[in-house]
A protein has these predicted regions:
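Serine-hydrolase catalytic core recognition
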Residues: 1-274
């Protein structure tokens, strides 16, 4: 059928104040009389956004490939993202666990009203790095909305990440008694709320986001008696290098199995045809 561009979308933020811009990918053979699960690809910033560059790109990650498996895929730049006004960028300063999630949910609900083929009862999310932080946070803070999440290499506790990130967007660490201002933003403090299916992934040699960020969440999930899935990639840094296609396939399989309710092909190999 050839290449097709994603649909440009505009929705309102959580308060109905600002226009939010994004992209939507649909299956090439979309049947508007059917219902499709929706997957939100997220990168919350605050130094960037989910959509990424506004320049033309023939492909944006594997979003179209994921859509072809039977999903609606969206990327929405929420409040707190750059390239807008100062007040827009500062929208959740010092509240890093916000992660634009109320904007994402508001936008997804508006899209479901606009496009009746979207099934909000089957909503998923995935992201890498800051998007991994946001995805786990979504599964813990909004467990009745997001049913499936894939959290890759997330900076789940910004006390264990670069100070030039945390202090820039959350402020200096301050302590009141036994609690500090970063504590309630850390995903391990919210892990007990998990209801859906969550996959955590991390490279064991990540020198950007140390793997102990994910171990903190794993420890909290175990203590809370929660079921989850874990993929640790030996010798991989913040990106997964030679294991990137493997992780992409695991991501596809996880959504197909748990959000679409289908059985993915066993050990499918992604790569050039021989």
């Amino acid at each position: 059928a050839g290449w097709k561009a994603p649909t440009r979308i505009t929705v309102k933020d959580r308060a109905g104040k600002w226009d939010l811009y994004g992209l939507m990918w649909t299956p090439t053979a979309l049947d508007s009389t059917k219902k499709y699960p929706i997957i939100n690809y997220i990168y919350p910033g605050p130094q960037g956004g989910s959509v990424g560059s506004r320049q033309f790109s023939a492909a944006t990650r594997d979003n179209q490939a994921l859509a072809e498996l039977g999903f609606i895929v969206v990327a929405i730049d929420g409040t707190g993202n750059p390239t807008r006004s100062k007040s827009f960028h500062d929208a959740y300063y010092a509240r890093m666990s916000d992660n634009t999630l109320p904007d994402q949910i508001a936008g997804m609900k508006q899209l479901a009203e606009r496009y009746r083929f979207i099934d909000l009862e089957r909503a998923g999310m995935w992201g890498h790095s800051g998007g991994g932080f946001a995805t786990a946070s979504a599964m813990f803070q909004y467990p009745d909305f997001f049913k499936v999440g894939i959290s890759e290499s997330g900076n789940h506790d910004n006390r264990n990440y670069e100070d030039d990130w945390g202090e820039r967007y959350h402020g200096l660490l301050t302590t009141t008694g036994a609690v500090d201002n970063y504590d309630k933003e850390a995903n391990q403090t919210l892990a007990k709320n998990l209801k859906g299916k969550l996959m955590l992934a991390h490279g064991t040699m990540d020198d950007n986001v140390p793997p102990d960020n994910t171990w903190l969440v794993v420890d909290a999930l175990i203590k809370a008696g929660k079921d989850f899935d874990l993929v640790m990639i030996p010798n991989a840094a913040h990106g997964y290098g030679a294991a990137s296609n493997y992780m992409m396939r695991r991501r596809w399989d996880y959504f197909v199995q748990h959000l679409l309710g289908a059985t993915p092909p066993k050990a499918y190999q992604i790569g050039p045809k021989s």
